[in-house]
């Protein structure tokens, strides 16, 4: 009986230590992210706040599947109303093109986070089925050009590389 109690006490101690160790590791990881690069944490929050740039991901995916990059002449009609605010736009938010949704999302993101959030969106599109090298290049090139397409002031085009993973 004493051996059984000793075994259970030892097992309980190991479980308690493992639980405390796991919790401490998670907390330290999150703190390290914010301390080493506070901008990265802020941009991650911006990305989540703006529904992970859903409209931008739709636009990027559509362009990559079509094998097109960025913005072309046939998109001119799509961008005519891009500058309209939601309340001025005759179409409801459900009917807006993914490009218009994307531009509206990007205008709401902090200027310092536009490129990091676009890179994150492009990475998610890439992970959701864009596997060919050409498709991956289209995904990241389209994402880089979106600030120009949406006429986001002071951003221009983003300078990031295609992520292999």
Curated annotation (Swiss-Prot):
Q: Which family does it belong to?
A: Belongs to the 2S seed storage albumins family.
Describe the task this protein carries out. This is a 2S seed storage protein.
Check the record and name the PANTHER family matching this protein: 2S SEED STORAGE PROTEIN 1-RELATED (PTHR35496:SF20)
**Complexes and interactors:** The mature protein consists of a small and a large chain linked by disulfide bonds.
- Which superkingdom? Eukaryota
The protein's matches in InterPro entries, at most eight in alphabetical order, are given as: Bifun_inhib/LTP/seed_sf, Bifunc_inhib/LTP/seed_store, Napin/2SS/CON
Keyword Disulfide bond on entry: yes
- What are this entry's molecular-function GO terms? nutrient reservoir activity
Q: Where is the signal peptide?
A: 1-20
Is Transcription one of the keywords UniProt gives this record?
Answer: no
For this UniProt record, the keywords arranged alphabetically read as follows:
Disulfide bond, Seed storage protein, Signal, Storage protein
Pfam families for this protein? Tryp_alpha_amyl
Give the propeptide positions: 21-37, 71-89
Q: What is this protein called?
A: 2S seed storage protein 5
Q: What biological processes does GO assign it?
A: pollen development
């Amino acid at each position: 009986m004493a051996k059984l109690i000793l075994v259970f006490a030892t097992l309980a101690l190991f479980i308690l230590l493992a639980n405390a160790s796991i919790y401490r590791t998670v907390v330290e990881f999150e703190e390290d992210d914010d301390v080493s690069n506070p901008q990265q944490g802020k941009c991650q929050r911006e990305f989540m706040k703006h529904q992970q740039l859903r409209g931008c991901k739709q636009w990027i995916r559509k362009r990559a599947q079509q094998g097109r990059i960025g913005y072309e002449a046939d998109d001119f009609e799509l961008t005519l109303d891009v500058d309209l605010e939601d309340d001025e736009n005759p179409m409801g938010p459900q009917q807006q093109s993914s490009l218009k949704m994307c531009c509206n999302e990007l205008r709401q993101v902090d200027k310092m986070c536009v490129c990091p959030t676009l890179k994150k969106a492009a990475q998610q599109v890439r992970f959701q089925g864009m596997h060919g090298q050409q498709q991956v290049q289209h995904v990241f090139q389209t994402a880089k050009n979106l600030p120009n397409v949406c006429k986001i002031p002071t951003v221009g085009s983003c300078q990031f590389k295609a992520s292999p993973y």
